[in-house]
Structure formats: C-alpha cells, structure tokens
From Swiss-Prot:
NCBIfam families listed in its UniProt record: ispE (TIGR00154), PRK14608.1 (NF011202)
Function description: Catalyzes the phosphorylation of the position 2 hydroxy group of 4-diphosphocytidyl-2C-methyl-D-erythritol.
Pfam families in the cross-refs: GHMP_kinases_C (PF08544), GHMP_kinases_N (PF00288)
Presence of keyword Nucleotide-binding: yes
Catalytic activity: 4-CDP-2-C-methyl-D-erythritol + ATP = 4-CDP-2-C-methyl-D-erythritol 2-phosphate + ADP + H(+)
Annotated keywords: ATP-binding, Isoprene biosynthesis, Kinase, Nucleotide-binding, Transferase
Domain of life according to the entry: Bacteria
Active site: 20, 148
Pathway named in the protein's UniProt entry: Isoprenoid biosynthesis; isopentenyl diphosphate biosynthesis via DXP pathway; isopentenyl diphosphate from 1-deoxy-D-xylulose 5-phosphate: step 3/6
Protein name, as recorded: 4-diphosphocytidyl-2-C-methyl-D-erythritol kinase
Species of origin: Bartonella quintana (strain Toulouse) (Rochalimaea quintana)
Family: Belongs to the GHMP kinase family. IspE subfamily.
Annotated residues for binding of ATP: 106-116
SUPFAM superfamilies per UniProt: GHMP Kinase, C-terminal domain, Ribosomal protein S5 domain 2-like
Length: 302
C-alpha cells in the first residue's frame, strides 16, 4: 500500500527504497567531462531495500539482509555518504543518526539499489529535520551522490514514472502513465556500471521518440517500447552472456515485453496483470532456483 512506503512515529522512520527500472535507455551523447547524456523512460516500485532511521547520540549504521555481505558498511556506503552529504549541506539542522539497511536487492544490478537508498536517507532527513528545502532543490544538490539519486528522490516524493534526460538531472513527471505488473530476474553476476560504459562503442545514438499517450495503457506502452532501445545492452552482454538466457526465460514465461534495466544485470518482463506476473515468477524460480526473481507492481495509474 502507498501508505506503507514511508512511516514515521516518535522520531523513528522507515522507508522501502525505490527500485528503478529503465524501460528505455538511449545514450545520445557525452559531455567533455566524461558524463554520458541519456534519455530514459523510468518506472519505479517501492519494494526495494528497507531503510530505517532514528535519532541517536552518535552516528551508527547497521547493514543486514540477504545481500549485505556484498556491500561495504563503512564510509563508502551510499547510506553513510548521503547522511554526511546532508550534514554538510544543512549544518545548522544536522544531527547524529542511526540507520539500519536491510539489503534485499542484488548489488550492482542496474535497478538503482544504492541510489534508492541514498534518496531514502535524503527523504527521511528532509522530513525529520524539518528542512525548508524543496524536493527539486534537494534533487539538484544530490547529483553529486550519483546520477540516479535525483530521479529516485523524485519517485519518493511524487510517486510517478519519470522521463529523464541529460546526466539524470532533467526530470519530467509522467502523471498519466499506467502502472505495470513486472517480474525482475537477476542471474547473480554483478556488472559494474563503469565497465559497461567503457565497452560502449557508440555514444551518439538517436534520441528517444515515444508518444506520451501510449503510456496510458499496458498494450499501447508495450507496442511503443518495440521502437525503443537500451543502448547499454550490447556492451553488457559482452560482460555477462547469461543475460540472453534471462530474457529467454522471461519471454518463455509469458512476458509481453522484456529488456535489461540500466547497465544490468537485472532484466524485467512486463505482464498483462499481477496474477500473470506472480505465476511467471514462480515458474522462473522453479526452473532457476539460484536466480533472484521478484514480481512487482510499479508506480503509475491503475
């Protein structure tokens, strides 16, 4: 339920951080500083990692969950970095904090887990510290934490799919975009974002052209997606050939459309409804018990 996404009581808060899904990802250029320019239709689901917060006399961070061993729990973690960022950005309001992250999503998987966690910290502290700072301003400031952090912050604030341009800072809300039933599948191999972009041979692909009216229904959206791309799939496939097997499994389980998200290795399948997605997830997990398989419902109009 939407009301369960972010909960606060007596200074204690928790949030299920957003899963970020690039339904399209067109790489249309590269800046002189090395940052790539993208155009992406991005969907979200509030079924990611669980981040809890409470005020504390000194800073503490606890990392647990099935994928915790694959992350660092020191100053390199985005939860810690996001808290440090907020303390420096708002020194008069800054307070020590206790954060506990239950890591439920695979690491380095192309669905914005770390960025979603950073956005969760920013969102919780903005609320708990009573900051006079708009989501838009905070999103602009947060770009230093990572290109996906601003869009994840927008997702937490506005709970809508987004159209993202530039290096991730140019964000448009898609208020009439439909919700989607999906299945996420990850075969277990981590794919480093830098490695994928390094393997990208062309950096000036054609821009994204999609009729916003097509986003209103599942059928019209699926049809429109056929004319779009994820320009990072081919370089990611060179690093992780198993991606083809994952997409095949999604298609065989009845997906209307399947694609890799972000830089991988997580792939998604779009299904006609929640029941079809759940059945497909059971089928894929039965055939591939070692894979990460998760049925989700995205933000959007029902």
């Amino acid at each position: 339920m939407m009301s369960d996404v972010k909960v606060s009581f007596k200074g204690h808060s928790y949030v299920f951080t957003p899963i970020k899904l690039n339904l399209t990802l067109h790489v249309v250029g590269q800046r002189t500083d090395g940052y790539h320019l993208i155009e992406s239709l991005v969907y979200f689901s509030f079924s990611g990692d669980c981040l809890s917060y409470m005020p504390c006399k000194s800073n503490h961070f606890i990392l647990t969950g099935p994928f915790a061993d694959e992350l660092v729990s020191d100053t390199g973690n985005l939860v810690v970095r996001a808290h440090d960022f907020m303390c420096k950005a708002f020194p008069k309001c800054a307070k020590p904090a206790f954060f506990r992250l239950v890591k439920l999503l695979p690491v380095a998987s192309g669905i914005g887990g770390g960025s979603g966690n950073a956005a969760g910290v920013l969102s919780l502290l903005r609320q708990q510290w009573g900051l006079d700072c708009s989501c838009e301003k905070l999103a602009e400031m947060s770009l230093v934490l990572g290109a996906d952090v601003p869009m994840c912050l927008f997702a937490l604030e506005y709970r809508q799919p987004l159209f993202v341009r530039g290096i991730g800072q140019d964000i448009t809300q898609l208020k009439e975009a439909c919700s989607l039933a999906m299945v996420l599948v990850n075969h277990g191999q981590q794919i480093a974002t830098k490695a994928v972009f390094k393997a990208l041979e062309k950096r000036d692909h054609p821009p994204l052209k999609i009729d916003l009216e097509s986003l209103k229904t599942v059928d019209s959206l699926v049809e429109a997606l056929q004319e779009t791309r994820n320009d990072l799939f081919i370089p990611a496939l060179k690093i992780a050939p198993q991606l083809s097997e994952v997409l095949y499994a999604l298609d065989e389980s009845g997906a209307l459309f399947s694609r890799m998200s972000g830089t991988g290795a997580t792939c998604f399948g779009i299904f006609k409804d929640k029941e079809a997605a759940q059945q497909a997830a059971l089928f894929i997990k039965l055939m591939h018990p070692d894979w990460f398989v998760k049925p989700i419902i995205t933000l959007g109009m029902l």
